[in-house]
Amino acid sequence: MNKQELTELTEFSRGYTKEVWFIHGANATPTSFNYIKESLERDPELNEYKFVDIIYDCQENLKSIISVLARSAPKDKQLYIIGHSLGGVVAVGVSQKIIQFDMPVSLRGVITMSSPFGGSESADYLRWLYPQYHLFRSISTTSRVITDLKSVGAVVPTLSLVTTSGNNPLFSSANDGVVTVASQRALKKSVYVEMPYNHFEVLVSTETVQHIKLFLKKQ
């Protein structure tokens, strides 16, 4: 039996019927979600859930990343997607692609944290100063990914945790130290919950874990 067959057998024996994708932010790694995943794994009511780390390079074309992930979605399990920061943009983009092309995927919902759905005004300028840095083009307010995201909005049940603490003085409006509150609230048809944390504290908050547990068990 090869490694893939052994993995599939183990999954079957454990009775996985649901899969949760964790998509990290720009220049981050799956380590970002360690606290959240460990907390979820201790909940006996979530034994049916398989937790999967999604790794991507934010220097690659974001539209291509979204398309590849949508095509990779499991056909035999209910799917939930959780994303932090840019990972939330990717998560919503994947959900839109799955619904747009009527893919045979049982996508149950999306959870985002501190995500720049409205793009970044800073990136509008930085993309010209650093044209080799693809991330700035991806999250500029006029990028195709951002404009499509805002135009279509949430297409499945979506919970967006909006972080409001941090207040970087370099921004002209309320922000979490990295992303403005306005940008986090730019996704239509999402349910918003404000969290009194900065851009990174949300990842180690017990309140965040409770919101995720409630969402997973409800959908």
Describe each region flagged by the PLM.
Residues 35, 39, 64-68, 93, ...:
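Alpha-helical elements of Rossmann-like donor-binding domains used by nucleotide-donor carbohydrate transfer enzymes
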